[in-house]
Amino acid sequence: MRESLTYETGLREECGVFGMFDLEGGDVARDMYYGLSALQHRGQESCGIAVCDTNGPKGVVNCYKGLGLVNEVFHEETLKRLGGNLGVGHVRYSTTGSSTIENTQPLVLKYFKGTLCLAHNGNLVNAFEMRRQLEETGAIFQTTMEIGRASCR
């Protein structure tokens, strides 16, 4: 007996992630905006940019995010306020978790070693089990995304 192969048809996307570092210390926010615009076909629910100045105060991260398209969320004055030479950006196409501002990435996490910015474009296969186990040990989650679960490890 011969097995038949089934192929998915149609567009199937996941989130888009864009990172940038300017060695000369220049502001990356505007270029991040253009990078996310180019990736926007991968996610149109929400977007965000987190930047820091590697020559400035340690642990200071400026983050701006919102629901909607890149050009709806970011405006000239917002990009100017972000300021920094290191950044990560994200456009979201949700496969798990609801489309809320809490689930918009990048996530900015503060922990005992400093500040961490996190963005991803995939799914964890054991996300629900991982969350249950972590909650049993006292972990508290602010989002319904899998990335929050992974960041607690």
Language-model segments: residues:
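Conserved short alpha-helical segments that host acidic/polar catalytic motifs at enzyme active sites
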Residues: 1-153
